[in-house]
UniProtKB/Swiss-Prot annotation:
Disulfide bonds: none annotated. The gene is MET14. It comes from Saccharomyces bayanus. Belongs to the APS kinase family. Pfam families: APS_kinase. GO terms for molecular function: adenylylsulfate kinase activity; ATP binding. This is Adenylyl-sulfate kinase.
Length: 202
């Protein structure tokens, strides 16, 4: 760890909040592969941007092929993957944006660390359990990953040969086999409004 770095003062969070007219937070979507996390994240990002609110989505496409391209899928690498995502997401939240993350993030301890990281910085962290029965996720299987996992082609696949630890007390619990993508995005939006993280835009 570098020890010769000086932390330079910057705009305070409250000053940024006043200038941008919105609070920052991290919306952390967690759930099985094919549960609908990325689809909901895209819909939520579009909804917020259409209302002239600052939002940015972090997912496998812009993390695994860039910042975390050196990581595999061992438990150690998964932990480091989530640690880095937590740090980046915190930076977006600190800039008074709604940072939307959509990762399986299967281990409860990693998600708790992400929450603690935000709490220590005085930033809001909203954990959302994107829930779907395993059999429904397997029926969806848009990338054919469950099929490969069942065949043994993919090792350590969450939900099949590796564990998924469901949140115990998420801020929101969405059943995507019972609600549409649009309904899920709207529920999250209303939560952010009700918690006074963002202002309601018509």
């Amino acid at each position: 760890m570098a020890t010769n770095i000086t932390w330079h003062p910057n705009l305070t969070y409250d000053e940024r909040k006043e200038l941008r007219k919105q609070d920052g937070c991290t919306v952390w979507l967690t759930g099985l592969s094919a549960s609908g996390k990325s689809t909901i994240a895209c819909a939520l990002e579009q909804l917020l941007l259409q209302k002239n609110l600052s939002a940015y989505r972090l997912d496998g496409d812009n993390i695994r092929f860039g910042l975390n391209k050196d990581l595999g899928f061992s438990e150690q690498d998964r932990n480091e993957n989530i640690r880095r995502i937590s740090e980046v997401s915190k930076l977006f939240a600190d800039s008074c944006a709604v940072s939307i993350t959509s990762f399986i993030s299967p281990y409860r301890v990693d998600r708790d660390r992400a929450r603690d990281l935000h709490k220590e910085a005085g930033l809001k962290f909203i954990e959302i359990f994107v829930d779907v029965p395993l059999e429904v996720a397997e029926q969806r299987d848009p990338k054919g990953l469950y099929k490969k996992a069942r065949e043994g082609v993919i090792k350590e696949f969450t939900g099949i040969s590796a564990p998924y630890e469901a949140p115990k007390a998420p801020e929101l619990h969405l059943r995507t086999d019972q609600k549409t993508v649009e309904e899920c995005a709207a529920i999250i939006y209303e939560y952010l409004v009700n918690e006074k993280i963002i202002r309601k835009h018509l």
